[in-house]
From Swiss-Prot:
Domain of life: Bacteria
Pathway: Bacterial outer membrane biogenesis; LPS lipid A biosynthesis
Source organism: Koribacter versatilis (strain Ellin345)
NCBIfam families: lipid_A_lpxD (TIGR01853), PRK00892.1 (NF002060)
Assembly: Homotrimer.
UniProt-listed Enzyme Commission number(s): 2.3.1.191
Family membership noted in the UniProt record: Belongs to the transferase hexapeptide repeat family. LpxD subfamily.
Gene Ontology terms for molecular function: N-acyltransferase activity
UniProt-recorded name of the protein: UDP-3-O-acylglucosamine N-acyltransferase 1
Role description: Catalyzes the N-acylation of UDP-3-O-acylglucosamine using 3-hydroxyacyl-ACP as the acyl donor. Is involved in the biosynthesis of lipid A, a phosphorylated glycolipid that anchors the lipopolysaccharide to the outer membrane of the cell.
GO annotation, cellular component aspect: membrane
Gene: lpxD1
C-alpha cells in the first residue's frame, strides 16, 4: 500500500517525504525490526533515538516530533494511529454462520441471525443471544443467560446461569463469568456455604481476557460497566463493580464488594481489599496493595498504598539503606572516640 494512501486512510499528514506515492508499505512492525517496506511508530520518548536511526519506510509520530531519516506520519495520538494502521494490513479470521453438528442447543434457547456455533458448544434452557455471535469450541452458556449482538466467546469460555451481557462483548479463552462468589459463614462444625443468588452483568464493549474470572454476587450483582477492559488472570470478587473505561491489568485481584470508578488504571498484581471504593481516574502502580478508600484522581503505589510520589521517594531511599547505615555507623564511631 502506498504511503499516501495510508496517510489518507488514517487522517494524518506527512512530513519528510517528497514523494509519498513512491513509498510502498507492506507491514506494521516494531521500530527495532522495521525495514524499508515497514511502517512503525513512536509514542514513548525512550524510543525517540531509535526513530532517528531506524530503517523503517515510515514512522507514525506526534506533531512535535523532530525529523529523522524516515518519512513521518504525523498524528495527535500516535499509539491510536498505530492501532488503526495494523487493521490496514491484518485481516482477522472470519467465521461462517452455521451450527456445528456436535453443538447442544436447548429448544428453548433463542440465537440471533448469522450465528457461528463451534464444536461441542452447549447452550442451555431459556438463553437469548443476539445477532452475529461467534461461539468457539467448548463454550458453555448456562440457563437463563441474556447476551446482546456481536458477542464473541473464544474456546472454553463459560457464562453461568442468569448472567446478563451487553453488545460487542469479547470473552477470551478460559474466561468464567458468574461462577459462585467466595462466600462462607462460620458454623459450629466448619464453614457453611452462602448461596450465591445474585448475578453478573457485563455492559457493552467489555472485553475480558484469558483465564480471568468475574464472580456472581451472593445477593445483588457484580457489574462490569461499559468499555472496561480486563486483562489475563484477573479475579473480580462477588458484589464488586468496575466503572466505565477502566483498565485492570494482569493478576489484579478485587476482593468482594470493592468498587472501582470510571477511567481507573490498576497495573499488574494490584490487590484491592474488600468493601472499598476507588474513585474515578485513579492510577495504581504495579503490586500496589489497596487497603483504604482512594479519592478520585489520585496516583498511588506501595503496599499498603500511599501517594505515588512519596512511594517513589521512599523506594529511592530504600535502595540507599546500606550506604546510609554505613554512614551512620561511621558517625557513631567518630562520636565515641
Amino acid at each position: 500500500m502506498k504511503l499516501s494512501e495510508i496517510a489518507r486512510r488514517l487522517g494524518c499528514t506527512l512530513d519528510n517525504c517528497p514523494d509519498p506515492d513512491a513509498v510502498e508499505i507492506t507491514a506494521v512492525t516494531g521500530i527495532e525490526a522495521a525495514g524499508p517496506t515497514d511502517i512503525t511508530f513512536v509514542s514513548n520518548p525512550r524510543y525517540a533515538a531509535a526513530a532517528k536511526t531506524t530503517h523503517a519506510g515510515a514512522i507514525i509520530v506526534s506533531d512535535d516530533f523532530t525529523a529523522g531519516r524516515a518519512p513521518l506520519v504525523r498524528s495527535k495520538n500516535p499509539y491510536l494511529t498505530f492501532a488503526k494502521a495494523i487493521e490496514l494490513f491484518y485481516q482477522a479470521p472470519k467465521y461462517a454462520p452455521g451450527i456445528h453438528p456436535t453443538a447442544v442447543i436447548s429448544p428453548t434457547a433463542k440465537v440471533g441471525a448469522n450465528a457461528s456455533i463451534g464444536p461441542y458448544v452447549v447452550i442451555e434452557d431459556n438463553v437469548a443471544i443476539g445477532a452475529n455471535c461467534v461461539l468457539r469450541a467448548h463454550v458453555v452458556i448456562y440457563e437463563g443467560v441474556t447476551i446482546g449482538d456481536n458477542f464473541f466467546a473464544h474456546a472454553h469460555a463459560v457464562v453461568r446461569e442468569h448472567c446478563r451481557i451487553g453488545n460487542n462483548v469479547i470473552l477470551q479463552n478460559g474466561v468464567v463469568i458468574g461462577a459462585d462468589g467466595y462466600g462462607f459463614a462460620r458454623d459450629t462444625d466448619g464453614w457453611y456455604k452462602i448461596a450465591q443468588s445474585g448475578t453478573t452483568i457485563l455492559d457493552d464493549n467489555v472485553e475480558v481476557q484469558a483465564n480471568s474470572t468475574v464472580d456472581r454476587a451472593s445477593i445483588g450483582e457484580t457489574h462490569i460497566y461499559a468499555d472496561a477492559k480486563i486483562d489475563n488472570l484477573v479475579m473480580i470478587g462477588h458484589g464488586s463493580s468496575v466503572g466505565e473505561h477502566s483498565l485492570l491489568c494482569s493478576q489484579v485481584g478485587l476482593a468482594g464488594s470493592s468498587h472501582v470508578g470510571k477511567n481507573v488504571i490498576l497495573a499488574g498484581q494490584v490487590g484491592v481489599a474488600g468493601h472499598l471504593h476507588i474513585g474515578d481516574g485513579v492510577i495504581a502502580a504495579g503490586q500496589t496493595g489497596v487497603q483504604n478508600d482512594i479519592e478520585p484522581g489520585k496516583r498511588i503505589g506501595g503496599s499498603p498504598s500511599y501517594d505515588h510520589k512519596q512511594w517513589i521517594r521512599s523506594w529511592q531511599i530504600q535502595t540507599r539503606l546500606p550506604e546510609i547505615v554505613k554512614e551512620l555507623r561511621n558517625l557513631a564511631s567518630k562520636k565515641s572516640e
